Design a protein with these regions (language model features):
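N-terminal accessory targeting/assembly segments
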Residues: 1-157, 168
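NTP-binding/hydrolysis catalytic cores, primarily Walker-type P-loop NTPases
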Residues: 380-423
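Conserved lysine of the Walker
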Residues: 239
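Hydrophobic anchor at the beta1->P-loop junction of P-loop NTPases
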Residues: 231-233
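Phosphate-binding/switch region of NTP-binding enzymes
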Residues: 360-394
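P-loop NTP-binding catalytic core
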Residues: 115, 119-225
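Walker A (P-loop) phosphate-binding loop of P-loop NTPases
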Residues: 236
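Switch/coupling sub-region of P-loop NTPases
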Residues: 245-365
Length: 423
């Protein structure tokens, strides 16, 4: 959306709704009344009082008292529906996320895309993004809501951090968000992804059509084996969903560590998470690379990474250089095309430690010999393929051999067999 020109009717839908006050001598917009209520509320109640109001009922009572006060002072008469809407909006602004609250409550919403205050789009389920009516009064309103989201996620908007990716939980739903500041984009750009309250299991992924029983019968032995693998797919294709389901069935005797960017995974208690931390005030942050080092220091025998990115190749160098590395399961962003995937992974390994030639490329093939790809096809998330790097005697580079491949609406066996033994 960012490359589109501003609409000529950008203010359409923001026309103020006016109500009379002060015995008819003045007109107030609903937005102005809302602002007055917010200001009066902040002046009236101390942080200690707000902490004591720890239920929605207690908070609504305080907001209703403030609303009644402002309406009385300004001699404004509203209908019961108008007053209820004003109280709801004040609650959302003071204790929630403003116009995003209704979207967060909608279980169908999986993505919210914001390009400044002028454009908003929503994805329902796994369909395409659809444009929304204007959500924010102006850029300042958008920024205030984004700042509140970031604060609740343990981050903050900073001029020295033009791009932030973090996560939080809203209404029991894991939420990841990325924000790009105007220094890198036209206006404040925000993408928000929402996961379901209950993460699907592997069996439920079969039931909802993500994959077949045949595919699961190949994945479970792979999961129980000693071999590492990559889960690859483009944005919002089910990579984290699949990793989360797999993590629930990892052998419990394994010492497993998960390195996460946004904390989207719902991990069983025996898995230790290390999540990226952003600097806040004087508190230093911890990058993805930092957390990989911290995770390795815990001496796990299995390491989950969600997700490996091409713009941080140095982060994976220790994983490919260790003489006795842990088993590794990577989530990687990329198209489920074997030529492009092989090229991207090879380039990632070469850039991880320039000067080592093809050493780390071969290490990647050895430590991550299986590849599982996922895709969004006709509005549904699908397991696209399962493949293996299989050695050849006539070259140092392995073949990408498909074991399962998407055809006729589902991933099906190709007839090729794994070169490595899977129980």
């Amino acid at each position: 959306m960012s490359d589109q020109p501003l609409r000529h009717d950008a203010d359409k839908g923001r026309e103020p709704r006016l109500v009379p006050g002060r015995s008819g001598t003045r007109l107030f917009s609903m937005a102005a009344l809302l602002e007055r209520i917010e200001d009066a509320f902040r002046e009236e109640y101390t942080p200690d009082q707000l902490r004591q109001a720890d239920t929605s009922q207690a908070r609504l009572k305080l907001i209703l008292e403030t609303t009644d006060y402002v309406l009385a002072v300004e001699s404004v008469r509203l209908t019961p529906d108008e007053k209820a809407d004003l109280v709801r909006r004040a609650y959302s602004q003071l204790f929630g996320y403003g116009p995003l609250d209704s979207l967060f409550l909608d279980e169908r919403v999986t993505t919210i895309s914001l390009n400044g205050a002028e454009r908003a789009a929503v994805r329902y389920g796994h369909d395409e993004l659809v444009d929304m009516p204007l959500l924010f009064e102006d850029d300042e309103h958008l920024r205030a809501v984004v700042e509140r989201l970031l604060i609740d996620a343990g981050a903050e908007l900073r001029d020295d951090l033009p791009a932030i990716e973090t996560g939080l939980t809203i209404g029991g739903r894991p939420v990841s968000m990325s924000a790009i500041l105007p220094s890198l984009a036209f206006g404040l750009n925000v993408d928000i992804r929402l996961h379901p309250r209950l993460a699907p299991t592997l069996d439920e992924l079969v039931q909802n059509g993500f994959m077949t029983e045949v595919a699961l019968k190949m994945l479970r032995p792979l999961l129980a084996s000693k071999y590492g693998f990559v889960i690859a797919g483009e944005t919002e294709t089910g990579k984290t969903t699949l990793l989360n389901a797999l993590a629930q069935e990892l052998p419990q005797q394994d010492h497993v560590v998960a390195i996460e960017r946004t904390g989207e995974l719902r991990l069983p208690p025996q898995i230790t998470p290390f999540t990226v931390r952003w600097p806040v005030n004087d508190r230093p942050g911890a990058s993805f690379s930092d957390q990989i080092q911290a995770g390795l220091s815990a001496e796990p025998n299995c390491l989950l990474l969600d997700e490996v990115r091409s713009d941080e190749p140095e982060a994976i160098a220790p994983l490919l250089e260790l003489d006795t590395p842990p088993r590794q399961i990577w989530v990687v962003r990329g198209a489920p095309d074997h030529k492009r995937l092989q090229s991207a992974l090879g380039m990632l390994a070469r850039r991880a430690a320039p000067g080592q030639g093809e050493t780390l490329v071969h290490a990647l093939y050895e430590r991550l010999p299986f590849i599982v790809t996922v895709a969004r096809i006709r509005g549904r998330l699908q397991l696209f393929s399962i493949a293996e790097w299989q050695s050849r005697i006539d070259t140092d580079y392995p073949d990408y051999v498909m074991l399962m491949r998407y055809e006729e609406g589902r991933a099906q066996p190709t007839g090729n067999t794994p070169a490595r033994w899977l129980d």
